[in-house]
């Protein structure tokens, strides 16, 4: 039995979707549970050459043997949830998903408030998905819960009970975190942050398990960190420099161009300490050095690629166990058992 939490080590967009999908296929967890804020964070999952952009359904959906869960701590937009369940019909998501009946519900009024609030939309760079205003209502105890919404009633249940029972039965459980540690309401670059905490301890609470149940925390870092929206970015490079390096990306939810920077070892060390990270996953190593593209054996990485990994391990103090060298699941180096 292993309970693994995957967290973003930067400002989101680290490539958690790819790492989560790989772990779900490799480790075959019985439950893949989603923690985090809500539908304000997007993940892109590629299956057999087809890309799926999702915001509510856990990114481990390609593993058709696993139950998919959305924890009580996750804000749920029924419209987005139902749309994604239909989009992923061939993966039988509708029969496998369990949404906690205590989850908070995002309504149209929350989205309208999010988009019309000048402070949120212009100064902070909110995604406009209604999460901030919904969390305000939750704090005021006026927010609807999943049990109050008929359209999703057939998907509702007790996620905490399901996850704890799976762990007690000796099954593997994977908990997906969203966004990134540096967007945490408590530990990020306030006020340019999201509307709740985005670290491992909070993700565990989101799905209803205690801290002693957690075995592994995988912190995901992109070789070139990116950020959408406003806020400090200590190692940010110019847009022209990013273009020269071939690093041009756009946000899954907002469509806005991502700001790009160089790897920040000091911030990475703080993030790993904050999350109690037991291992690191590095994504987009092929963007750092194109000679690393598609490599699946660590020893066959270029010297430049190996030097990057070694520097991360030495300066951050946590072992790099997973390395993504391309968008496909098989384009992954896994040294967890070495």
UniProtKB/Swiss-Prot annotation:
GO MF annotation list: adenylosuccinate synthase activity; GTP binding; magnesium ion binding
Presence of keyword GTP-binding: yes
SMART domains xrefs: Adenylsucc_synt
Pfam entry (one): Adenylsucc_synt
Annotated gene: purA
Positions bound to Mg(2+): 13, 42
Keywords: Cytoplasm, GTP-binding, Ligase, Magnesium, Metal-binding, Nucleotide-binding, Purine biosynthesis
Cited HAMAP family: Adenylosucc_synth (MF_00011)
Record family assignment: Belongs to the adenylosuccinate synthetase family.
Positions with a binding annotation for IMP: 13-16, 40-43, 127, 141, 179, 194, 256
Location(s), subcellular: Cytoplasm
GO CC aspect terms: cytoplasm
Organism this protein belongs to: Methanococcus maripaludis (strain DSM 14266 / JCM 13030 / NBRC 101832 / S2 / LL)
Metabolic or biological pathway, per its Swiss-Prot or TrEMBL entry: Purine metabolism; AMP biosynthesis via de novo pathway; AMP from IMP: step 1/2
SS bond list: none
Protein known as: Adenylosuccinate synthetase
Function, in words: Plays an important role in the de novo pathway of purine nucleotide biosynthesis. Catalyzes the first committed step in the biosynthesis of AMP from IMP.
Taxonomy, superkingdom: Archaea
Substrates-to-products reaction catalysed: IMP + L-aspartate + GTP = N(6)-(1,2-dicarboxyethyl)-AMP + GDP + phosphate + 2 H(+)
Binding-site residues, GTP: 12-18, 42-44, 258, 284-286, 324-326
Cofactor: how bound: Binds 1 Mg(2+) ion per subunit.
Main location per the UniProt record: cytoplasm
Subunit structure: Homodimer.
Metal-binding in keyword set: yes
Cofactors required: Mg(2+)
EC number: 6.3.4.4
Gene Ontology biological process terms in this record: 'de novo' AMP biosynthetic process; IMP metabolic process
């Amino acid at each position: 039995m292993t309970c693994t939490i995957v967290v973003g080590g930067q400002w989101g967009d680290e490539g958690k979707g790819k790492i989560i999908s790989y772990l779900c296929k490799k480790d075959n967890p019985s439950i893949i549970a989603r923690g985090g804020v809500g539908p304000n964070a997007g993940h892109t999952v590629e299956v057999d050459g087809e890309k799926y952009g999702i915001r509510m359904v856990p990114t481990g959906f390609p593993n058709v043997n696993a139950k998919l869960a959305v924890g009580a701590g996750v804000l749920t937009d029924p419209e987005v949830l139902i749309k994604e369940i239909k989009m992923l019909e061939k993966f039988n998501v509708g029969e496998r998903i369990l949404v906690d009946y205590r989850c908070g519900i995002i309504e149209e009024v929350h989205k309208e408030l999010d988009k019309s609030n000048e402070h949120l939309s212009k100064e902070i760079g909110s995604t406009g998905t209604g999460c901030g205003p919904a969390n305000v209502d939750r704090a005021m105890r006026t927010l609807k819960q999943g049990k109050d919404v008929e359209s999703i009633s057939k998907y509702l249940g007790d996620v905490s009970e399901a996850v704890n029972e799976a762990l007690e039965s000796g099954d593997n459980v994977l908990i997906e975190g969203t966004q990134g540690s540096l967007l945490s309401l408590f530990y990020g670059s306030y006020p340019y942050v999201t509307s709740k905490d985005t670290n491992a301890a909070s993700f565990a609470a989101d799905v209803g398990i205690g801290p002693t149940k957690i075995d592994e925390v995988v912190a995901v870092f992109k070789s070139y960190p990116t950020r959408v929206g406003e806020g400090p970015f200590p190692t940010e490079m110019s847009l022209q420099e990013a273009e020269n390096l071939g690093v041009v990306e756009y946000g899954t939810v907002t469509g806005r161009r991502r700001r790009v920077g160089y790897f920040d070892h000091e911030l990475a060390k703080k993030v790993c300490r904050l999350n109690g990270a037991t291992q690191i996953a590095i994504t987009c190593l092929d963007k750092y050095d194109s000679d690393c593209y598609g490599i699946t054996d660590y020893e066959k990485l270029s010297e430049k690629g190996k030097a990057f990994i070694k520097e991360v391990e030495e300066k951050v103090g946590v072992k790099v166990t997973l390395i993504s060298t391309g968008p496909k699941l098989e384009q992954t180096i896994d040294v967890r058992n070495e």
